Amino acid sequence: MTDLNLPSIFVPLVGLVFPAIAMTSLFLYVQKKKIV
């Protein structure tokens, strides 16, 4: 049962964390370009 619970926790976690990192890096890239 624990093996079935782990993916259900990790999938949404990765699905939220990965886009968050991508958005943050993109935002910082745009901010750096605007300043320069």
From Swiss-Prot:
One of its GO terms (biological process) is photosynthesis. The chain crosses the membrane at residues 10-30. InterPro entries: PSI_PsaI, PSI_PsaI_sf. SUPFAM superfamilies: Subunit VIII of photosystem I reaction centre, PsaI. It is found in: Plastid, Chloroplast thylakoid membrane. It holds the Pfam family PSI_8. Keywords: Chloroplast, Membrane, Photosynthesis, Photosystem I, Plastid, Thylakoid, Transmembrane, Transmembrane helix. It is a single-pass membrane protein. Its main location: plastid. One of its GO terms (cellular component) is photosystem I. PSI consists of a core antenna complex that captures photons, and an electron transfer chain that converts photonic excitation into a charge separation. The eukaryotic PSI reaction center is composed of at least 11 subunits. Only detected in green leaves and not etioplasts; PSI is only assembled in green leaves. Belongs to the PsaI family. NCBIfam families: PS_I_psaI. May help in the organization of the PsaL subunit. This is Photosystem I reaction center subunit VIII. It comes from Hordeum vulgare. The gene is psaI.
